[in-house]
Amino acid sequence: SAASDVYKRQIYGNSGLGKTHLLLAIGQTIRHNNPSAKIAYVKGEEFVNQMVKSIGTGTAENFRQKYRNADLLLMDDIQFIAGKDSTQEEFFHTFNCLYEAGKQIVVTSDRPPKEMKRLDDRLCTRLEGGLLADVQPPDLETRTAIIRTKAAQFGMILSEDVVKYIAENITCLLYTSDAADDTPCV
């Protein structure tokens, strides 16, 4: 139903636009509002590796429960599971389990589901059935404001010419995703 589709979200866009930062902020907000919430965060590549390891060590059920018992599942860079059939199958069932229980699922990727080559059709349909958020690079005015703000945070005084030059020549401002270390890496 449309009301329950808000439980499924995908944030997509090019690298360096803050998708991971948004994903972590969602997790922090849920944790702040509900300290007992079970939040599972995993990168797509880690999900693949953990699944393979759990099969090899006979702990697949523990792996499943780790994610299926979450109140909120955050998966960063879901595109890394595309083309990995058994991993996609596992994630599909995990997704369904959480969705049917009314739990929240938020994923990030570098492109929308339909553009992910070798993404299982069923999984693509599930992802497209929720809210899709396309993160775009900031415009010139926004980049200028970000540069001024960051310069001030670091105690730097930049002339308007320097701010303008940076804003016009760097269209994507990259920051580390670690909220504790918001150091620019432009």
Task: List PLM regions with ranges.
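Short conserved motifs of the RecA-like P-loop NTPase core
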Residues: 157-169
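Conserved AAA+ ATPase "SRH/arginine-finger" region at the nucleotide-binding site
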Residues: 130-141
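Short glycine-rich substrate-engagement loop in P-loop NTPases that contacts/grips substrate
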Residues: 40-69
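Walker A/P-loop nucleotide-binding motif
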Residues: 8-22
